[in-house]
């Protein structure tokens, strides 16, 4: 009898989580083609934890943010997914966590672009982000401050505020040649500041920057500055295959 009760409780909890995710949506959202020659090329979570804005961004790049994957983990779909930019201005009724906003962004593009994707998991070379033998050197973020600004690149590294280790690992994946999996078991949110040489990494640099060659490698920087380490390993990597996508009508809100 106790087993039956426990199973029922687990099923009820799973159902509640799935329902909560299914009902996460922005209160107001505008999705439209970007103006020809428009400037921007950026998608970001706005201060206040209620709003996502994209300016002049193709669907493929929007997907990397919504699903927390790198560009190399997305395949398929029509050619315009890579080449035609869109503007998005989406606002939630109340402040949300970053994870919830990402789910809301997923639901938005799945609805507006009639997006259908298939997940494909492959066992590939990865880096595991682990705590180095000397222990972590990461400032814990003030739990009373709920703002989640996105991590940003700087001329000689990157900075992030209120960052989980899982999201930090994803950010590292975007600039390295393989996916990074969080194995730190560090549960808090942290303020991260990392200085390293960008030269030879996958960070976009429109104009040659002499500072890109300055500083330690990212592997050395992680050890010396944060007490973390990238350990080569093999692990599961999630790939998204676009099976269907349609352009949204103009001025859809």
Language-model-derived ranges and their functions:
Residues 2-253:
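Beta-strand-rich assembly/attachment modules of structural machines
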């Amino acid at each position: 009898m106790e087993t039956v009760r426990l199973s029922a409780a687990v099923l009820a909890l799973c159902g509640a989580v799935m329902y909560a995710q299914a009902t996460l949506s922005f209160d107001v959202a505008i999705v439209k083609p970007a103006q020809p020659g428009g400037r921007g090329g950026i998608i970001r979570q706005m201060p206040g934890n209620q709003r996502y804005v994209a300016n002049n961004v193709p669907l493929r790049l929007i997907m990397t943010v919504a699903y927390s994957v790198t560009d190399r983990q997305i395949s398929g779909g029509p050619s315009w997914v890579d080449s035609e930019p869109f503007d998005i201005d989406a606002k939630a009724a109340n402040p949300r966590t970053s994870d919830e906003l990402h789910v809301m962004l997923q639901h938005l593009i799945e609805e507006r672009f009639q997006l259908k994707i298939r997940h494909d998991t492959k066992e590939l070379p990865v880096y595991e982000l682990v705590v180095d033998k000397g222990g972590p050197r990461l400032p814990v973020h003030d739990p009373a401050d709920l703002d989640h600004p996105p991590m940003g690149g700087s001329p000689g590294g990157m900075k992030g505020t209120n960052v989980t280790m899982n999201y930090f690992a994803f950010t590292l994946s975007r600039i390295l040649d393989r996916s990074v999996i969080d194995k730190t078991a560090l549960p808090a949110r942290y303020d991260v500041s990392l200085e390293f040489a960008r030269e030879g990494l996958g960070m976009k640099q429109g104009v040659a920057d002499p500072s890109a060659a300055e500083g330690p490698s990212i592997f050395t920087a992680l050890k010396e500055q944060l007490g973390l380490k990238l350990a080569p390993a093999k692990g599961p990597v999630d790939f998204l295959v676009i099976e269907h996508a349609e352009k949204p009508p103009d001025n859809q809100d």
